[in-house]
Amino acid sequence: QIETNKKCQGGSCASVCRKVIGVAAGKCINGRCVCYP
């Protein structure tokens, strides 16, 4: 998993993870987006 510094209040991490790892797979943990390659 790849932790990002993107906050994810009231939103999904799909667009963030798509930019970071090329796959829209991730979830919000402790207010931050965590992506799963």
From Swiss-Prot:
Origin superkingdom: Eukaryota
InterPro entries, per database record: Scorpion_toxin-like_sf, Scorpion_toxinS_K_inh
Compartments in which it is found: Secreted
Modified residues (Pyrrolidone carboxylic acid): Q1
Pfam families per the UniProt record, alphabetical: Toxin_2 (PF00451)
GO MF annotation terms: ion channel inhibitor activity; potassium channel regulator activity; toxin activity
Site residues by UniProt (Basic residue of the functional dyad): K27
Assigned keywords, A-Z: Disulfide bond, Ion channel impairing toxin, Neurotoxin, Potassium channel impairing toxin, Pyrrolidone carboxylic acid, Secreted, Toxin, Voltage-gated potassium channel impairing toxin
Function text: Inhibits A-type (Kv4) voltage-gated potassium channels of striated neurons (Ki=131 nM), probably by acting as a pore blocker. Has also been shown to block ERG1/Kv11.1/KCNH2 potassium channels (IC(50)=7.9 uM). The presence of the Kv4-associated proteins DPP6 or DPP10 is mandatory to have high-affinity blockade of Kv4.2/KCND2 and Kv4.3/KCND3 channels (80-90% inhibition at 500 nM of toxin). In contrast, the presence of the Kv4-associated protein KChIP1/KCNIP1 does not enhance the affinity blockade (only 40% inhibition at 500 nM).
Protein name listed in UniProt: Potassium channel toxin alpha-KTx 15.3
